[in-house]
Swiss-Prot record:
The chain crosses the membrane at residues 39-59, 73-93, 124-144, 156-176, 180-200, 209-229, 254-274, 276-296, 310-330. This is UbiA prenyltransferase domain-containing protein 1. GO terms for cellular component: endoplasmic reticulum membrane; Golgi membrane. Prenyltransferase that mediates the formation of menaquinone-4 (MK-4), a vitamin K2 isoform. InterPro entries: UbiA_prenyltransferase, UBIAD1. GO terms for biological process: menaquinone biosynthetic process; vitamin K biosynthetic process. It comes from Dictyostelium discoideum. Pathway: Quinol/quinone metabolism; menaquinone biosynthesis.
Length: 330
C-alpha cells in the first residue's frame, strides 16, 4: 500500500514539474527579446511602406526620360532620399499623434511604434527633427542641382510646400485631415500628382500636366494601402471619435471600394495606353491574379497582414508602370 502511495506521489511530482517547465517555456515565448534603439528607430519609420514614395519617383522620372531623352542620376538620388525621408517623417508624426489623440493604445493598436520599440517620447521627437532636417537638406541640394530660379520658385517650392503641409497635417494639429475623413484624398495627392510631378520637374526643369495624368493609376493603388489600414482600424477610430472614410462606409462598402480602386487604376491605365497607342503601358496587368487574391483576403476579413501585402502590390505595380512608360517611347 505504501509503495503505491509513493508511486502516486512521484507521478504527481513528475506531472507538476512538467507543467512548471511548460509554463516557464510559454512565458519565455511570450516575452519578446528587447529591440535595440537603432532597430526601434528603423521600425518607427515603417520601412515596409517606404517603397510607396520610391515608385512615385520612378514613375515621374521614367515619364521625364520618355519626354526629353535625358537623365540626371544625381538628381534622382536626391529626390529619392528626399521623398523617402518625407514619407518616413509623415509615418512617425502619424504614429505620434495617433497615440496623443487616443486612436492608438497599447492594448489595441496595430501600430506599435509608441509602445514596443523601446523609444521614449523624446526619442520620437528627436527622430522627427532629424527627418525634418534631412528633408530640408535634400530640398537644398535639389535647388542647387537644378540652378533654374524660375522653375524653382514657380514649381518646386509650391509643390514641396503643399506636399509637406498635407503630409504633416494628415494627423498633426490643428487640422488632422485623417480624423475628418480626408485621409484618403491626402494620400492620393501626396504620393500621386505631387510626388510624380516633382520627380518629373526635377529631371525636365518644367511643369507638365501629363505627369498628373500618369500619376493616377499608381496613386489609386497607394490609396488602397491606406484604405485597408483604416478598415482594420474602424472600431478603434470610432471609439476615439475619429471620422475616416472607412468608418463612415462600413466593412461591406469598404470591400467594394478596395476592389474598385484597382478596377479604376487599370481602366485609367488602359485609357492612357489608348491615347498614345502604346499597349505596353498595361504591363501591370500581370499582377491581376495577385490582386484577386488580395481582394478575396479582404472579403474574408483577414486584414492582419493585408496592409503590408497591399503595399508590396503597389510597389510592383509602380515598378511595372515605370517600365511600361520607358518602353512606350516613340
Amino acid at each position: 500500500m505504501s509503495t503505491t502511495i509513493n508511486r502516486n506521489e512521484k507521478t504527481k511530482q513528475v506531472v507538476n514539474k512538467t507543467k512548471e517547465i511548460k509554463t516557464e517555456s510559454s512565458q519565455q515565448q511570450q516575452q519578446k527579446p528587447p529591440i535595440s534603439k537603432l532597430m526601434g528607430i528603423i521600425l518607427a519609420t515603417r520601412p515596409w511602406s517606404l517603397t510607396i514614395s520610391v515608385t512615385s519617383v520612378l514613375v515621374g522620372s521614367a515619364l521625364a526620360f520618355r519626354e526629353i531623352r535625358e537623365f540626371d542620376s544625381i538628381m534622382l538620388s536626391i529626390i529619392l532620399v528626399g521623398a523617402v525621408s518625407l514619407q518616413a517623417l509623415g509615418n512617425v508624426v502619424n504614429s505620434f499623434y495617433d497615440c496623443k489623440n487616443g486612436n492608438d493604445t497599447k492594448e489595441k493598436s496595430a501600430d506599435r511604434t509608441m509602445f514596443d520599440f523601446g523609444l521614449t517620447e523624446g526619442n520620437i521627437i528627436n527622430l522627427i527633427w532629424y527627418l525634418l532636417i534631412q528633408c530640408a537638406i535634400c530640398l537644398g541640394l535639389m535647388i542647387f542641382r537644378m540652378d533654374n530660379i524660375k522653375c524653382i520658385v514657380e514649381n518646386i517650392l509650391p509643390l514641396g510646400a503643399f506636399g509637406f503641409i498635407l503630409n504633416i497635417s494628415y494627423t498633426a494639429a490643428p487640422i488632422g485631415l485623417k480624423y475628418i475623413g480626408l485621409g484618403d484624398l491626402t494620400i492620393f495627392l501626396c504620393f500621386g500628382p505631387i510626388l510624380v510631378q516633382s520627380a518629373f520637374i526635377s529631371q525636365t526643369h518644367y511643369h507638365d500636366s501629363l505627369a498628373y495624368f500618369y500619376s493616377i493609376p499608381l496613386a489609386l493603388t497607394i490609396v488602397a494601402v491606406l484604405h485597408v489600414n483604416n478598415t482594420r482600424d474602424i472600431k478603434a477610430d470610432t471609439e476615439a471619435g475619429s471620422i475616416t472614410l472607412a468608418s463612415k462606409l462600413g466593412f461591406k462598402n469598404c470591400y467594394y471600394i478596395y476592389a474598385g480602386l484597382y478596377l479604376f487604376a487599370y481602366i485609367y491605365l488602359f485609357k492612357l495606353s489608348l491615347d498614345i497607342d502604346k499597349y505596353i503601358l498595361n504591363l501591370p496587368l500581370i499582377l491581376i491574379p495577385k490582386i484577386i487574391s488580395l481582394i478575396n483576403q479582404f472579403k474574408n476579413k483577414k486584414l492582419e497582414d493585408l496592409t503590408e501585402k497591399t503595399g508590396q502590390l503597389s510597389f510592383f505595380f509602380g515598378g511595372l508602370n515605370a517600365i511600361g512608360v520607358l518602353l512606350s517611347m516613340q
